[in-house]
Regions:
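Active-site/substrate-binding loop(s) of hydrolase catalytic cores
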Residues: 110-119, 127-284, 290-296
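Hard-cation-handling environments
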Residues: 278-474, 478-481
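Accessory, solvent-exposed terminal regions and/or long lumenal/extracellular loops of proteins
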Residues: 526-529, 534-622
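Soluble metallo-hydrolase cores and metallopeptidase-like ectodomains found primarily
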Residues: 62-116
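Acidic/histidine-rich, surface-exposed loop or edge segments in extracytoplasmic proteins
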Residues: 37-56, 118-120, 191-192, 432-439
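Second-shell loop/turn segments in exported
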Residues: 50-58, 122-126, 194-198, 247-251, ...
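Substrate-recognition/cap regions that form aromatic- and gly/pro-loop-enriched pockets
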Residues: 431-436, 444, 451-524, 528, ...
Length: 622
């Protein structure tokens, strides 16, 4: 009994602590909106858990899937399929909403209707999309929204990170207003799914990419909730903007999609905004930064695939109900727009897929900044004093704040005051392409890189397998310098990998590729993606993610008693080598005093030296 009293007391204490954490959050703005009419009445047999609880809670995995299975069984418009299993054995389900009788991938594509693929719960604490999708699919099946499927097919993944969804707690996201039970950011392997699109380590992202390959959606939506600053917007969303490899799609998202969605959201009482990342994390007046991350991110990956991609970031400080309803409106608005504009978007997409740049940028830079920035490194960067052009401006619907000095840490921190204000701020954009790589005809990959080949296949990249050895004239990279660690050279693992960066020197050579090698032509829609994954200087290449660490290991060597007389003989036989040796010692004093380095240098000049040492094994056919 004492143990039971302690348990109950502990629960009450934890609930009180959770409530106290919520009370520390900035003041909440009162909200009423037309979209509240979408909330089911209490007597509706298909009312969701979120609606029933007044948007205090969200259903767990079992309850969610049980509800969906009943809904699907009752409606001829809905089909439910498992697209994969998590490492803990949970099915990752996708709901297909279509007026077509046959909902196979081939049949849906043959129907000619544009396909919207939307996913929720890639970060399962940010679960608004799941509850919004439940409500919308309910209204499509049994409400007044059936007509949404007249000209569009809708694929919906309610929970992508299913294991993390069950790692639920009221303490997972202290800077977010509801629901009371929130899932975890990373999956059961502690991997962030929204850093996995390029390397595809996880079953969850492999499942999503398989859906992309099979169904070929015309638009892809990834629904999140922010971490960060306060402002008036309850929903922010958009594509990459002008930065990226799909200019036609970018233009459509900016000039057609965003205005239409903004109009519908505003009409329903919401305040939509563009994607926001503060340049200074305690002072938004310093500006906003929009950058293109690599294809590790969902929206950047979609851009590399030439697939219109929308990143949704609901505002964490707005109440759960308001965020869910905003997501409902956005999903419905997207379906309506695709019904009239989906054909045009398909044509634009095909044009982007046909682009074959002679030189492909591996990154995008903010012209007004000296430093490279990305989503994970954008706060407090330095602005260039010699900027080529002034940045755009943005009328930010912000919240008044003040900077306080902490009595605990003695550092400055921001306090949001809950008062709406409008600020005109600079809006920095990563629109300058950089780190260009000349497009090769294709890449040759030996069978020893079978893991890389398998991952490229999973991406849907087309390749040819050779059954006989083939000698090919190729360009190959020799790694001349390399550093382990992230962009700041911090030697620590990131997303299950030890990252590496290096400089390369190109070597033209005839290389024998064994049977089982593959050839990947860059003359294909996913040619740019292949380049970003295979070029070592790309931050999201398999080289950079540490898949080729074995090339940094030397496995054969020569003893000094062999190398010393050989080096002496080499100098006697070649005055040119003697001159090169003297110049090397004069230029590198550390080398001149290091006997091992000297003998290694001579060893590298012999035919005994391992030619594969520091040689990146992928060949470029020019």
């Amino acid at each position: 009994m004492k143990k039971l009293r302690f348990t109950i007391g502990t629960i009450y204490m934890l609930i009180a602590l959770s409530a106290n954490a919520q009370s520390i959050l900035p003041p909440v703005m009162e909200w009423k909106g037309k979209s509240e009419s979408f909330i089911a009445k209490t007597n509706n047999p298909w009312i969701t858990t979120a609606e029933k609880s007044g948007f205090q809670t969200t259903p767990d995995y079992k309850e969610t899937m049980r509800w969906f299975k009943k809904l699907v069984a009752a409606s001829p418009l809905l089909t439910m399929v498992s697209i994969g299993k998590s490492v803990e054995g949970r099915d990752i389900y996708m709901i297909m909403a279509s007026s077509e009788k046959n909902t196979t991938a081939a049949a849906l594509k043959k129907s000619g209707k544009p396909i919207l693929l939307a996913q929720a719960g890639i970060h399962s604490g940010e679960i608004d999309g799941k509850d919004a999708g439940m409500m919308l699919l309910r209204d499509i099946a049994f409400g007044n929204k059936k007509s949404l499927l007249n000209k569009v097919n809708f694929l919906f993944i309610p929970i992508l990170s299913v294991d993390a969804h069950e790692h639920s707690s009221p303490y997972n996201r202290p800077n977010q207003r509801g629901p009371q039970n929130q899932g975890w950011r990373t999956n059961a392997q502690n991997l962030n799914l929204n850093r996995d699109y390029a390397k595809i380590d996880t079953r969850e992202i492999r499942s999503v990419i398989q859906v992309m390959n099979e169904y070929d959606p015309v638009l892809y939506m990834d629904i999140h909730v922010t971490d960060g600053v306060d402002y008036q917007y309850d929903i922010t969303f958009g594509g990459l903007g002008l930065q990226g490899n799909s200019p036609g799609i970018a233009q459509w998202l900016e000039t057609t999609y965003k205005p239409a969605a903004d109009k519908d959201l505003t009409a329903n009482g919401h305040i939509p905004g563009q994607l926001l990342t503060a340049l200074n994390d305690i002072d938004f007046s310093k500006g906003n930064v929009l950058t293109a991350g690599g294809p590790r991110f969902s929206d950047s990956y979609g851009n590399m695939r030439h697939m219109a991609s929308i990143l949704v970031e609901n505002h964490s400080l707005k109440p759960f109900k308001q965020r869910v309803l905003a997501t409902y409106v956005l999903l419905e608005s997207t379906l309506k727009l695709l019904a009239t504009q989906g054909g045009a978007l398909k044509e634009i997409t095909e044009k982007d897929k046909a682009i074959r740049l002679a030189k492909v940028p591996m990154a995008w830079k903010v012209p007004q900044m000296d430093e490279m920035v990305n989503f994970e490194r954008s706060a407090n960067v330095k602005i260039s004093v010699a900027a080529a052009a002034p940045p755009d401006s943005l009328n930010l619907l912000g919240i008044a704040s003040r900077i306080l000095k902490s009595p605990v840490t003695n550092a400055d921190y921001v306090e949001w005051l809950g008062k709406p204000i409008t600020m005109k701020i600079v809006n920095y954009k990563g629109t300058e392409p950089t780190d260009f790589i000349t497009r090769p005809k294709g890449y040759w990959i030996p069978p020893s890189c079978d893991d890389i080949i398998a991952r490229l296949k999973l991406h849907g990249i087309k390749m040819e397998i050779i059954n006989e050895p083939r000698e090919v004239a190729v360009e190959m990279y020799r790694i001349t310098k390399y550093v382990y660690g992230d962009d700041n050279h911090q030697l620590e693992p990131f997303e299950g990998h030890m990252q590496v960066s290096g400089t390369t020197k190109a070597e033209t050579r005839k290389q024998l590729f064994p049977a089982g090698s593959v050839y990947i032509s860059t003359d294909q829609p996913l040619g740019d993606l292949a380049m970003v994954l295979l070029e070592p200087t790309s931050k999201d290449s398999y080289f950079s993610w540490g898949f080729f660490l074995s090339i940094f290991q030397r496995t054969e060597y020569m003893e000094a008693y062999v190398m010393e007389p050989m080096a002496k003989k080499m100098l006697e036989d070649s005055s040119a080598l003697q001159k090169e040796f003297e110049e090397k010692k004069a230029a590198d004093k550390v080398f001149a005093k290091d006997p091992t380095a000297i003998l290694t240098w001579f060893y590298s000049k012999t035919k005994f030296y391992d030619d594969r040492y520091l040689l990146y094994p992928v060949g470029r056919e020019l």
